[in-house]
Structures are given as structure tokens and as C-alpha cells.
Amino acid sequence: MGQFITLMQSIPEALNMAFNVALVIVSLLCVTKGLINLWKCGIIQLLMFLALAGRSCDGEYKIDRRHVLSHVEFNLTRMFDNLPQSCSINNTHHYYKGPENTTWGVELTLTNTSVMNRSDENVTSIRSLGFGNITNCDKTGEAGHTLKWLLNELHFTVLHVTRHIGALCRTTAGAGLLIQYNLTTSDKGGEVGRHLIASLAQIIGDNKAAWVGKCYNNCTSSGKCSLTNCEGGTHYKFLVIQNTTWPNHCSYSPMSTVRMIIQKTAYSSVSRKLLGFFTWDISDSSGQHVPGGYCLEQWAIVWAGIKCFDNSVMAKCNKDHNEEFCDTMRLFDFNQNAIKTLQLNVENSLNLMKKSINGLISDSLVIRNSLKQLAKIPYCNYTKFWYVNDTITGKHSLPQCWLVSNGSYLNETHFKNEWLWESQKLYNDMLLKEYEERQGNTPLALADLCFWSLVFFTTTVFFQLIGIPTHRHLIGEGCPKPHRLTSNSLCSCGFYKIPKKPFRWVRKGK
């Protein structure tokens, strides 16, 4: 009886506490709902749009309130610092720089004027370049390895030719390296000069194909002319190879060297599958490995700092093997392990790198990108990759290759559908993971029902609101996000260039 009386006496106190809690909850809900309504009505977005209309659109591309488009750009210079690197000033002057921090290089020049005269200096004909035997020609002592490697690739790897009647070299001691090919001379095995220039085009890249292709201009009596009998040749008569200093002739890149190494792989008709998996791990500032992902060190990327990707991204690489980003990651991983375990000289390092690239890079991807490059379709150069970054959780999507067209990277607007799709996939993966974690810890009970009921009620209230328009939308065009159109229908980023196009005001999300 006494316990019952005590219980009845405590009811008012309990009710008073419950009412206080209810008032706090209602107050929080009202404030929260008021802020949400203020944001959802569109007045803040309208003021921001009017303040920023016509400004530059070069900032980061925000997909939504938590996803932004980011990218990582690789620095391949250190990875391939034991390989010669090349660049081109124009269609006639090309350079190969020696490995690492050397100050010398090899210059390749296409010209119509011969630089050799048998009567003025010591000149010998090169009858055989078997095994890179250029001892009599190379008087520099330091460029020998690079020169032998270059000639071997030109003659054996690409051409399978060991002789060239029109090749001359200077043998004067102390005069430096000088080799001249007569591109108009052919031996009994075929038009070696024509094949030589075609192989040089493959090495330098498709963008230098302007001087590959010779046509005859046939004109009729009526004055009409047409190009006929086009061949894979050049109108230049001589290819001159000589040693030179390296005062930064042009911005060199190892990609031409990599293209030379993998060019046979690009034309392979048999596809390989990787036989093993790589162990991805994360390294802290002291170099200790911590499980949980993979970090690119400072030397591997263009800007300073360390960029890490979690295990979910790396797991996709180990599962599918069908992305250029995964190929590049395997090259970095191989390079890192090779540095730790191997002490090789330059030639052995080069041979090992050639075998590793042929064994690691997926044939199907190389073939696909090579065909795209030949067809003038945007292709991947294995250097720059974009990904979607969740600014709240720090999660990333699997990086995709940033395609190249006409020697420059595509603008973000050209692949907007791709990064929007990656954002949606990242959302789905995160929601699925959160749902599985919640189901594993607690079942969907009363708290979940209350939460989803509140979300449903709030959503139905929002549907009844009439919002304020937030931005200009060109009639008949896609949504201009994130372009800030002026009253003349223009944007300073240059994507919308036609003025006075009809537009209408729309609300965000419509």
C-alpha cells in the first residue's frame, strides 16, 4: 500500500520532467525546421546567384552539398628516372635526355641538307648495327648507352632490320657523335628509310604524324589537282643524330620512352590477365606500414603532400583489373618494391622495367587507348586521374582516367555525366554500408520507425512550399550547373558563348 502511494506521488514530477523534455524537443524541431525552410525556399541561393552571376567558374566543381570533383596527377619523372626522356620542339627537332640528372642528350633532326662530307672528315658507313655495336661512331664516352638503346629500339624492336646502306657516322676523335641516315636510300630488304621514319613517328607520338605521309600532287589540264599515291614516308632526305648539351630545350616527359617500350604490347592480339594480387597498405610519416589503404608519397604526385586511397578503392583494382588508374598504381607499387630489394645498374634496370611494364599493364586497355589515339578520340595517357571525393567522410570513388584530346586534358564539362554517375555510385555504396552496419548492430525497431516517420512528415511539408527561383536556365539546354549565367546568357568560363539566348528562372533541383 505504501509503495502504491509513493508511485502516485511521483507521477506529477515525472509528468513535469516529460513536459520539459517535450518543450525542448519541440523548440529544437521548430528552430531546425525554420532554418531548413529558410534554406529550401531559395532566397539564400538567389542572393548568392545574383552576387556571383558572370563571375569565373574555375573553382572546384561541387556536385552537391558534400561531393566535389577532385583529381590526382602523377609525377612519373622519378619513377622512370633511369630511362631516357624525350621531347620535341617542332616537327624537325627532337631530343632525348640521358637518365637521371645528366646534362647531355641526343638530338634527332630531320633535314634536307647533308651534314657529312667524306672529303672533309673521317666518315665510315654503318653496315651493321647488330647488338648496338657503334663503338667506332661513339666518341663521347657518356652517351653510349642511351644511343645504343635508341638505335636498338629503332632497328630491332620496331623494324627488325639490322642494315641500312645510307647510314654514315663520323669517326674523328674528340669531334663528338654524328650519325646521318639517308632516308631516300633503300637496301635489298625494302624501304628501310620509310620504315625508319614510321617507327620514329610511333616513338614520338601520333601528334607528330604531320611529317609522316608523302603524297604526289597530280594536276589535270583543266587545273584540278588531287593528292595520290600517298605513302608512309617524309619529304625530308636525312635524319641526323648527334650529341648535344641539355639547356632545357623543351619540357621533356618520360611518356615517349614508355610508349617506345610498350608499343609492341599495344599491337598484341593476345590478352593477358594478371596472375597475382598486390598487397596495398598505408604508410605513416615515419614510413611504417599501417593496414587500411594505399598512400602515394610526395615524389609520386605533382603537388606536395601525401594522397591516400582507402581499401574500398584498391579492392576494386584487385577485383577487375580494367582501369588505367589501377595499372599506374601497380607500376608505382612495383617501382617501390624494386628500389627496396634490387641494386641494379642502368641497363639491367631498363630491361627489368621493360619486362615489368609488359607484364603489368592490361593489354586490352593499352590497345583501346592506342586505337582511340589513332582515331583522334579522347584517350588516356596514364598521367592524370579524376575521382569524386566525399568531403564529410573522406571516401573516394575509384579514380578514372582524365582523357586527353589534341594534346590537352578535357574540360570538366565534357564528362559531367561520368562524375555525376560516380557520385551516385558513391552514395549507394555508403548507404548500403551504413544499412548493413545498422542491421548488424540493432534491428529496425521503434527508433527507426519514429525517425523515418518524421522524415516522411517533413518531406510532405516541404512539398507544399512554393520556392523562389535560384538560377537562370537556358531554354532547351541542360542544367547550367555550376555556370553562373548573366542576363545576356553568358558565362565567363567560356562554355556559353552565344549572347541573348532565351532563358527562364528555375528553382534549384528543378
UniProtKB/Swiss-Prot annotation:
Q: Domain of life of the organism in this record?
A: Viruses
Which residues make up the binding site for Zn(2+) 1? 57, 483, 491, 493
One GO MF term attached to the UniProt entry = metal ion binding
Q: Where is the lipid attached (N-myristoyl glycine)?
A: 2
Q: Would the keyword Disulfide bond turn up in this protein's UniProt record?
A: yes
Give residues annotated as binding Zn(2+) 2: 471, 473, 479
Q: Which residues lie on this side of the membrane: Extracellular?
A: 2-17, 54-58, 59-448
Q: Where is this site: Cleavage?
A: 58-59, 275-276
Q: Which residues are glycosylated?
A: 75, 90, 101, 112, 117, 122, 133, 182, 218, 243, 381, 389, 406, 411
Q: Any stretches that span the bilayer, and where are they?
A: 18-32, 34-53, 449-469
Q: Where is this site: Important for GP-C-mediated membrane fusion?
A: 33
Task: Provide the disulphide bond pattern.
Answer: 87-250, 295-308, 317-326, 380-401
Cellular component terms (Gene Ontology): host cell endoplasmic reticulum membrane; host cell Golgi membrane; host cell plasma membrane; membrane; viral envelope; virion membrane
Q: GO terms for biological process?
A: fusion of virus membrane with host endosome membrane; receptor-mediated endocytosis of virus by host cell; virion attachment to host cell
Residue ranges annotated as Cytoplasmic topological domain: 33, 470-510
Q: Name one Pfam family in it.
A: Arena_glycoprot
Query: What protein family is recorded?
Result: Belongs to the arenaviridae GPC protein family.
The text the record gives for the protein's domains is: The cytoplasmic domain of GP2 plays a role in ER location. It also contains a zinc-binding domain that allows SSP retention in the GPC complex by accepting a cysteine from SSP as the fourth ligand.
Mind telling me what this protein is named?
Pre-glycoprotein polyprotein GP complex
